[in-house]
Each structure stands twice: as C-alpha cells, then as structure tokens.
Amino acid sequence: MTSREQVSRFIRSSFRSVWSLEVLLLLKRERRPWTDAEIVTALRASDLIVSQSVSALGDAGLVVTDAAGRTEYRPASEDAARLVEEAERLYAGSPDAVRRLILNASSSGLAAFADAFRLRKD
C-alpha cells in the first residue's frame, strides 16, 4: 500500500486544479475514448478547463490522446495507476482535504511570484 505522504505528493504534483482530478476520475470510471466535447458535457465544464486538464493529465502520464483527439485513461506505469487508485480513495473519503492539497499546491507558486514583487525596507 502507498503511504499517505506519497499520495499527497502525487496529488500536489499531478493536478493543477480539482477539475483535472474530476476529468481523470471520469475517464477512469468509464474507460473508453472520450472527445473533449463529451467530457465538457459529462462534467458541465468549459472547453478551456477540459482542454487544459487533458493536456496536464497527458503531461503527467495519466491519459493518452489519439490522433482523432479522443482521450482515455491510461497511466504510464503500475505505480501511477496505484497512486491514482489511492488518490481516488482519499478524494471519496476526504474531498475537502484533497481540494486543499490541490489548491495549496497551485497557490504556493502564486505566493512565490507575488513575494518577488513585495517591497522590503533595507
């Protein structure tokens, strides 16, 4: 079994938004090739959110998109598949905790960027 810390690291590094996690779980739950339009309809999301999520999930090695633009769940490794399973379990049991992990990971980059412009007294 994978440790909670490994799952937390995986969630923070793999999902730029909660939407990305929702897209992945949809593709995992209904294993078939999906067009972006079908994902938009199923999740009631925007085209932009879905295209960014699919791109990020592909970069993370969790989905593949064919030449026709259809995307399906296909983790690059057994370890990645196991981490997805654990992330799904954690999200089902503690959705707020998972949302905080994702939001804190994305906002830490913003905080660092903002800090670069903070005026300091010398």
What are these regions (language model features)?
Residues 83-122:
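Amphipathic alpha-helical dimerization/coiled-coil segments
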Residues 1-22:
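Short alpha-helical segments that sit at the start of domains
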Residues 44-59:
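Short amphipathic alpha-helical interaction segments
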Residues 26-27:
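Hydrophobic structural patches
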Residues 23, 32-42:
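Short acidic, hydrophobic short linear motifs in intrinsically disordered regions
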Residues 11-18, 35, 67-89:
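Short, cationic-aromatic polyanion-contact patches
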Residues 58-70:
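A short, conserved structural fragment
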